[in-house]
Amino acid sequence: MRIVARRVEGYAHDVEIEGGHRLRADEPGTIGGTDTGPSPTRLLGASLASCIAITVEMYAERKGWELGPVEVDVEVGYEGPVPTDFEVGLKLPAELDDEQRRRLLVIATKCPVHKVLAGEAHVKVVERLEAA
């Protein structure tokens, strides 16, 4: 998968994601951005919330469990500008039994974004030279 971020103005960047998707990332005006899109750290929280929701829904579907809409909320705690804590709330239907609930809470920790945040990925920054 390839993702490319290109500066628009100030800190605003248009992001192209393989598959034809586009979005804008920016910083709030309070730190010099123009607030034309969510900040990268807010996008990280959004990625976690949506990844958990999709993972839980896919698992329940494979098991034949009727979930209806799942709601996931993420509270992000910071140390300075760095997000250090993610508290995830998973709202499940009251009709599920205790074992189903327990299983879905475990499955929520198996989503790819959760795994990355838990330190299971490697990030390497390399310089790419422009062609002359």
Spans of model-derived segments:
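Extended beta-strand/beta-hairpin segments
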Residues: 1-46, 54-132
